[in-house]
Amino acid sequence: MEEALEARPRRWIDSLTSLRIEHYVPKLRKNRIREQRIHNEVIVDAYGPEEQALGWYYYLENKIQFPFSARCMAAKVVSPLRKGETVDVRSLAPEDSCAHDMLVLIRWHGRNVAVPLSQLTATDADESTVEAIGDWHYWLAQGSCF
């Protein structure tokens, strides 16, 4: 068992021991416009992880027009979706559910299910929605988290 763990990348082991949620999104090149928008509209007055989460929640709530269609970009352990599945996104999950990740509610097999926004890309949405989701993906890709 120890040999198997030693073969794993160190970052993976560190994330397990600290119980930190890791987002495996490819790192994007710096985007000055996006950086300024995120700073000025999302985290400008945030003095800690809880306030950053609230900043993101209200930013996304104001910018995203629900409902919209989205496709799953990658499967995640915490979500029932498989890569390539298309879903209708109905709303943000309740605020208290988004303290560690931004979750959205979808209708899936006759049930309302919360899934990470980070695993979805909008396929039929307005410009504001696409931009807001892109900002969230960008922030995660830069290695940021709450």
Name each region found by the language model.
Residues 29-34, 129-146:
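Long, low-complexity intrinsically disordered regions
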Residues 90-92:
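Residue-level recognition of beta-strand microenvironments
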Residues 12, 16-78:
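Mixed-charge, Lys/Arg-rich low-complexity intrinsically disordered regions
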Residues 5, 121-122, 128-131:
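Lipid interaction determinants
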Residues 77-88:
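Short coil-to-beta-strand transition motifs
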Residues 111-120:
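A short macromolecule-binding patch
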Residues 73-75, 107-111:
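Short strand-coil-strand connectors
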Residues 96-105:
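Short aromatic-glycine-enriched beta-strand elements
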